Amino acid sequence: MGNIKSRVNELHDLLNQYGYEYYVQDNPSVPDSEYDKLLRELIDIEEAHPEFKSPDSPTVRVGGEVQSSFEKVNHDTPMLSLGNAFNEQELRRFDQRIREQVGSVEYMCELKIDGLAVSLKYVEGRFVQGLTRGDGTTGEDITENLRTIHAIPLKINEPLSFEVRGEAYMPRSSFIRLNEEKEKNEEQPFANPRNAAAGSLRQLDPKLAAKRKLSVFLYSVNDFTDFDATTQSGALDELDRLGFKTNHERMRVGDIEGVLEYIEKWTKQREQLSYDIDGIVIKVNDIEQQDEMGYTQKSPRWAIAYKFPAEEVVTTLQDIELSIGRTGVVTPTAILDPVRVAGTTVSRASLHNEDLIHERDIRIGDSVVVKKAGDIIPEVVKSITERRPEGTLPYSMPTHCPSCDHELVRIEGEVALRCINPKCQAQLVEGLIHFVSRQAMNIDGLGTKIIQQLYHHNVINDVADIFYLTEDDLLPLERMGSKKVENLLKAIEDAKANSLEHLLFGLGIRHLGVKASQVLAEKYETMDRLLEVTEEELISIHDIGDKLAQSVVTYLENEDIKALIEKLKYKNVNMVYNGIKTSDIEGHPDFKNKTIVLTGKLQQLTRKEASAWLELQGAKVTSSVTKKTDLVIAGEDAGSKLTKAEKFGTEIWTEEQFVAKQNEISS
């Protein structure tokens, strides 16, 4: 036994050293095959002698047991956000304020990694807990997923107790591999590496997180008690010494001019990195000066984040492709010469509608400027007319549907062209794809390509047909083995139990979104009651307007739709609301039964987190301000919704007021 224990310790040391060289120093001393061989040996020993497996064994990198949920945990000290600067003038104002308060100052400039903020707690040198930022006060415990990231040391060589914070991210190479795998499996690819990293760390199965090949850069120490560092740069050097991965592109500068030079450099060179950045973080380097300056309620006064402007690139517009949505809207898409924009290769970009094409005089063959709105959605900004080839013609939208050849119409008050043929194949297929989507019936494994095959082989013609599928229908399809078919049929069976709001949203009734589906399902409880509802009844409901009421009643009165519902009932698809009713939520009197709108950029929590918390308090969170809105919570750069709220005399809170009320209720 002594020899086995000794070998286990030796394997720990070797694997930790080789992992540090590969994942932190990026300078491996042994080939991957040697690392894999040693890891396999350790796994075999631990399986034969589980008494020798420790919580910080290198084998935890492959992932442990599936978790049922992520526990909410309070941060020892809040994980605050940073104030933003978008131009040189705002940076100079920040510098002036700093110097007025503390005098002479040195700055530490660091790359702002585009990932997910995490907090890692070490006790006596061992990694014991990892949290997401959450709302800044409370995060989710994702310890088991973070253990799979090789760049996070499970144990350090000194028995120190402290908290270190950083950014978990997905390298571009991992992102490309992951999306290739998703496309191969007919799954929706991630929009960008940031979303991929966040989604990976929220997997309940750590083994899935382990496969995603995430990394991390650590950038701050929360408690300096066990550290000799007196500066931010010194703290990062100390983290380096202890074996943590920090970003070595950081730079100390003596004044704001040095900051601006650093920003200029990385604005030009960001694409040369192997990971995404979305800005530069500027911090006062001296920790005593940081303490002197202190914090606002939401951010440190001694730091600011400079956000890069949306990157614009020039490429050639090769064609304009038209797609038909499930409601018949014809959407033009630019087909481009592939070009890298904000970290990903773009070959398609939105053109929105016919009016935009004409306003910007965009023509096939033009050199066009492309950017990503919010660094996510590619769009064509303009044509460069001085580069326009001779003989190009203004683009004309077709008069007939490219799918069914039905005449296209423009409904009064709308900018979109629309196909109104209810038998249009493109619309029917898009409707099927919508029906199985995550927010609708959430049928995992029934992707776009499978639906297209089933439709074009006349196996399914409407959404009810999905519940009549058999093994014989699915096995002949491309890439459909018996195991995949078994899993898909189970997912279809499970979907039958979905609450009524999922079915309502999945049916694709025009103007009926997720929130309104929830409202109707909760109000009427069964599909049978909904089938009898009148427009007047619907309009009297707080969140239902005239257009939606008319659309719902017209849809449900259609005899074909009534037959479709009967067809779904025959296969025991649930037609009853089985969620929690708002009236049953205890909630808080400041929010219960109130209609609330969130607008602007929230700094201390995400829009999704704020909405979820408000709904737990019994509120209804909607997307538009009306005379029926009770409260508007306005973040930074709030626009027309705030103006509308002021016009209606609606109560308005700042984000700070909202967070203060959250803290009051939670305490």
Curated annotation (Swiss-Prot):
Catalytic activities: NAD(+) + (deoxyribonucleotide)n-3'-hydroxyl + 5'-phospho-(deoxyribonucleotide)m = (deoxyribonucleotide)n+m + AMP + beta-nicotinamide D-nucleotide
Its job: DNA ligase that catalyzes the formation of phosphodiester linkages between 5'-phosphoryl and 3'-hydroxyl groups in double-stranded DNA using NAD as a coenzyme and as the energy source for the reaction. It is essential for DNA replication and repair of damaged DNA.
Cofactors: Mg(2+); Mn(2+)
NCBIfam families tied to this protein: dnlj (TIGR00575), PRK07956.1 (NF005932)
GO BP terms: DNA repair; DNA replication
InterPro entries per UniProt: BRCT_dom, BRCT_dom_sf, DisA/LigA_HHH, DNA_ligase, DNA_ligase_AS, DNA_ligase_CS, DNAligase_adenylation, DNAligase_N
Protein known as: DNA ligase
Source domain of life: Bacteria
Residue numbers annotated as active site: K112 (n6-amp-lysine intermediate)
Keywords from the named record: DNA damage, DNA repair, DNA replication, Ligase, Magnesium, Manganese, Metal-binding, NAD, Zinc
